[in-house]
């Protein structure tokens, strides 16, 4: 069976890694690498403390979070020594004790069904510094020991490397979809038209430009996201700290080597723009410094900028598109893409060779977001 994957972000790379283990599959991966959300992302894996009301979103992200240890075990078995994911715990901050209590109640209830949450501890503002030395915020937090962090760029690179080792072809090329003389969907490459038994479109916010020329409407929009990278150079300030989710849009992700990731922006009016916004980056930096003053001494390493994909109801979709059973698609993962994307990628790999899903996928079917035009 010959399968193409278009897009090598978190979904495409995970799908490629899983499919490359199947010796009956001839796999080709296409990705031009421009604007990819995953390569720009370092993320917090801790969906259990989210207060989003959408149960389908929670079910998917919780399953994605629980898949990470399994995926890391696979990478380790295949020789990876620097794992991109680590369980370091997460601190989730709230403005008032009442909101903190509400969050604790939600998390405690969810822990009855999800052991991966780990230990939950409510921490007063003045005690946060025992978890993150130098912390100077005025809000309390819930500490979730099961929370983790992942370097999206490293995770993608490692999975693509292993896929190539397993025989997959990875092409750095921008491709499109079209129909041949018989009406079959084919991949248009720089060297001509390529036919495949199955095609997986995992191109994030760019899914519209690939699918709509085939005669469909796609409910996906782009959102620009910016992160900043800092580095603490003083040895005493480095440590294995939990990731920190502030009550606004800002997260702080400390790494053991002294690197600190701060972000991210959620810009709905910038389309596919990938330029630095010094004003927004400075605002994020100042907000982070208010609660973590040691960042004022940090070296500014640069920024990461990518484009996320969102649907109108903020729920991801994945599966085969209407009336095209050989074409699979995934998009709309938004800012929780690193959490749900590994599981979606694994599911698409499985669905492309076997119609029996490992997970109830009906709520995420593309038919809810992709309509055939008459």
Q: What role is predicted for each listed range?
A:
Residues 4, 14-21, 30-32, 43-44, ...:
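Active-site substrate-recognition segment that forms the wall
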Residues 189-198:
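Core beta-strand elements of the Rossmann-like FAD/NAD(P) dinucleotide-binding domain
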Residues 59-63, 93-101, 142-158, 275-280, ...:
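Short beta-strand to alpha-helix junction loop
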Residues 44-127, 287-289:
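Dinucleotide-binding Rossmann-like beta1-alpha1 core, especially the glycine-rich loop
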Residues 1-9:
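Beta1/beta-strand and adjacent pyrophosphate-binding region of the FAD-binding site
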Residues 81-92, 109, 119-166, 265-270, ...:
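Helix-loop-beta segment of a Rossmann-like dinucleotide-binding subdomain
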Residues 294-374:
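C-terminal catalytic lobe of FAD-dependent flavoproteins
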Residues 148, 169-185:
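A conserved short coil-to-beta-strand element within the FAD-binding core of flavoproteins
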